[in-house]
Structures are given as C-alpha cells and as structure tokens.
Amino acid sequence: NEKIVNASGDEKESLLKEMAILKSDLSKEEESLGSVTKKWQELMLDVPNIPDVSVPVGFKEEDHEEIRTWGEPTKFNFKAKNHIELMESLEMVDLERGVKVAGFRGYFLKGDGALLSFAVHRFVMDEMVKKGYEPFSAPSLIRSENFIATGHFPKSKDEVYKTQDDLYLAGTAEVPMTGFHMNETLKEEELPKKYVAFSPCFRREIGNYGKDAKGITRVHEFMKTEQFILCEASHEESVKFHEELTANSEEIMQKLGIPHRVVVNATGDISQGAVKTYDIESWIPSENKFKETHSSSYYHDFQSRRAGIKYKGKDGKTAFVHSLNNTAIATPRILIAIVENNQNEDGSINIPNVLVPYMGKDVTRK
C-alpha cells in the first residue's frame, strides 16, 4: 500500500493492475482449495478408527473370541417351542396383522407381550438410575450431522430411513445422545457424563437374514434403552468405562436369568469408529445357539472430533472427550430369550422374578 501511495502516475497504474491480477488469481486458488478441501473432508469420513491391539483379526463371527459365559444353556425334558409358537399361542404377538399394517417384518406386541416389553424397559431404567446414570427419553427424528458425528454416515446411509423433511430415523439413541453435547466445551469436573436413554429405533435391515427374517428377531421398528458415557481423553478411562458398561448389561442379564456369553468382536465386525466392541449373546433354545442381543463399544475421540465435543482441563487446556455406548436392553429381541428360556411344557411362560413387580404376575398362560 505504501509503495502504491508513493508511486508515480504510470507506476501506480501498473501496480494497481498487478494487484487486480493477483486478487483474481488468489480468488481462483481459494475456490480451487475449497473444492479440494471439501473432497478431502469427504474422503476422511471414510477413514476408520484404529482397533485396539487386543481385538482379534478376522471378518466372520467365527473369528470372534469368547471372553466369558454365564449360566448353563437351558435344556428341557419336553419338546421346546420357539418364540413364535409360544407368543402366538399366548396371544402375546400378532405377526399376520403386523405385516398387514406395517409390511414385511411388521408385528404387534399385545397383551402380556406388550406388558413384558414395558416391564423390561422399566426394570432396566430403574437399575441404571440406581447406578447413577441420568435418564433420558431421546428423539428419533435426527439431523444428518448427528449421523456423520457417530460414523453412521456416509457408510451406512442406506440402512437409515429418511423423511421428506430431510430428517432421519435413528437406529439407536447413540446418535441423539452424541448430538446432545455437539459443539460444546465441558468442564473436566463434569466428567464422566453417564446417561441412559430410551428411544424408538428404526432400521431398514436390508439383506437376507434367513431364519432371522421370521418372528421378531430382525424388525424395522423396535425399542431400545441405551447406555452412553463421555469421559476424559484417556485410553485407561475408556477401557475402565467400557468394562463398566458391559458389566452393567451382564448384571441385567443375570438378574433376568438368561444364559449368555460375552465375545470380543473381530476387526471386520466392528463399526467404523469403534476401537473395541464386545457383544453379549443370549442363549436361544430353539436354535441351540447364542445370538447377539447387546453391543458395547468405545471410540476414543473418533466421534467427539466429528461432533466438536471438548472439555477444558484444570490446566486450562482443551481436549476432545472420549465416547462409549452399550445396549442396556432392546425389545422385542430380548423377549425371544426370555420366553424361550422360561417356557413350561403346557406352553405357559414363567416371568423372571425381577419383572414380577412390573407385570403383576409370575406366569403368563392361556
């Protein structure tokens, strides 16, 4: 500027023209940089987190490693029924009318089936509140940026229902609970944040799942109570709370009396952002196998960086929090394990002791 001010007429005109050219060139370069930056950001959304060294390498369920089991697989001295036979005979579910109303995978829980679902969630919520978790009823209609934050978008976008208002239906309360503190800076003394959230959940469940397409194993709409934690940026803290979340669900399963096992998922069967995932698998007598009913994961700062969730330490420095989540309970899937493991020869079903106060009965029968 000083050079232009002190320049003679012709020189000043030349300098002004040169500046105009530079300004135009800079504008073009900035536009090009913006395009490259946008492409880079899109590519970075596909980059996965780094699994913990303890995670087994593999892509199939057979590659998972069993950590521990609880209870003996239930055996009967009579021909046991599957959950469809049991629940239809006791008018706990109506699949035919469910399909008529909601299409493929549609269902109605009714009578004691509906009451059992309510009882399970109320019992679990009470248990988690006793442990100091703050209860939430979370929204299911969610903005896309929340799915990007959790790592569900763009990879799993085809699995999510979209509305005409550009909102999406969440398949887990992990999504809205991550968004709850989006772009906030918490105080270190506020951590850990321990939440338990109930929400209706929706998943398109694209693909052929064989036997799981029948009954209420894989459905488009279900209810879930989810555990969620934000903690300090420490691997040791993440590991500690991961074990806590998993132990909470194991305790719930033990109180329900459902035989189960805990496995650590192989690298090819954990989500994009997860560092490590445990599955809890419940014993299903009609299939003579354990099947996944809970999923417990920690992410380090993978989700919090995308969501912009930080905390300010006592030293004045800021860092991204670490996030974790785990299924506390999900219905109707857990009902399969409850009714099949508690059936009697006459087709009646014993209600787990911890659910009797919520159900008002200890057995359901015709």
List where the protein language model places each region.
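N-terminal alpha-helical targeting/anchoring segments
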Residues: 1-74, 92
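TRNA-recognition modules of translation machinery and tRNA-sensing kinases, especially anticodon-binding
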Residues: 69-366
